[in-house]
Every structure is written in structure tokens, then in C-alpha cells.
């Protein structure tokens, strides 16, 4: 039930962002989407977070049910914004530190992740370019 409520809340946030007047700045829209994305990740709603990924990326690198089931094996214990910057091409990057707990072993670890966002003029929205965080990268 709480997952359904979280998804509805995320969709409402997206609808509000989409319905914002055109006078709203791109920066404000980006902050709102980043907040919605971070909330989805913090609450383990990776399917909801996937909806904020660039449609081109979703088409070229689709996630399977098995991929989503891997995300259900972990719990997010923290999501910290370490800072960001705007690149020359208009993209915005944000460094994130994510606390990850394995639900089976209860072992906690920290993963660093770089979000990359681009503004889509046609859709009048920001999209996450890099996909969902790889919580299993053993580098």
C-alpha cells in the first residue's frame, strides 16, 4: 500500500512540475525533479525513479524485471548531495553519496554516484541521462 501511495505522490509531483507556468525557471524545475528523484530513490521506488530517466536511455538500455528485483534486495539508508555544477553543454551534474543496506546480510556500505541531467526543450523538462545508480559496482 505504501508503495502505491509513494508512486501516486511521485506522479502528482511530476504533474505539478509539468503544469508549472512557463515563467518558472529551468533551475527551479530541475530542483523539483531532483527532489522527486531523490525521494523515490530514498524510499526504494526505483520504478518511479526510472520514469525520470531520459526516454532515449530507457529505450536503448531498458531495465528488466530481474534488474528491478535486484533493487528490492537493498534498502537505502542515506542519500546525500555532495554538490554539483553546470557543464558547458548545459547539462547539470550532481555528485551523490548513497547509503545501501543489503536486506539479506544487513551489511551497510556507501556508494558514490554522479547524476547527469539535461534539459529537453521540446518536452520542457529535465531528464536524468545516466540511468539509475549502479549499487553493485565493485570498483
Give residue spans per PLM region.
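Bacterial N-terminal signal peptides that target proteins for export
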Residues: 1-9
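C-terminal motif of bacterial Sec signal peptides marking the signal peptidase cleavage site
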Residues: 16-19
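Bacterial signal peptide processing site
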Residues: 21-23
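Short, aromatic-enriched amphipathic alpha-helices that serve as compact interaction elements
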Residues: 26-42
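Short solvent-exposed beta->alpha transition segments
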Residues: 31-32, 46-93, 106
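Sec-exported extracytoplasmic/periplasmic mature domains
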Residues: 38-42, 46, 51-58, 99-102, ...
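Exposed beta-sheet edge and beta->alpha loop/turn motif
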Residues: 87-139
Amino acid at each position: 500500500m505504501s508503495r502505491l501511495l509513494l508512486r501516486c505522490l511521485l506522479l502528482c509531483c511530476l504533474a505539478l512540475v509539468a503544469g508549472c507556468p512557463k515563467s518558472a525557471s529551468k533551475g527551479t524545475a530541475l530542483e523539483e525533479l531532483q527532489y522527486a528523484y531523490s525521494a523515490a530513490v530514498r524510499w526504494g521506488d526505483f520504478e518511479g525513479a526510472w520514469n525520470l530517466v531520459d526516454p532515449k536511455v530507457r529505450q536503448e538500455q531498458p531495465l528488466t524485471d530481474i534488474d528491478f528485483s535486484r533493487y528490492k534486495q537493498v534498502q537505502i539508508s542515506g542519500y546525500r548531495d555532495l554538490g554539483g555544477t553546470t557543464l558547458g553543454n548545459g547539462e547539470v551534474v550532481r555528485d551523490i553519496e548513497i547509503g545501501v543496506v543489503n536486506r539479506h546480510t544487513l551489511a551497510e556500505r556507501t556508494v558514490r554516484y554522479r547524476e547527469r541531467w539535461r534539459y529537453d526543450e521540446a518536452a520542457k523538462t529535465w531528464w536524468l541521462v545516466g540511468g539509475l545508480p549502479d549499487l553493485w559496482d565493485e570498483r
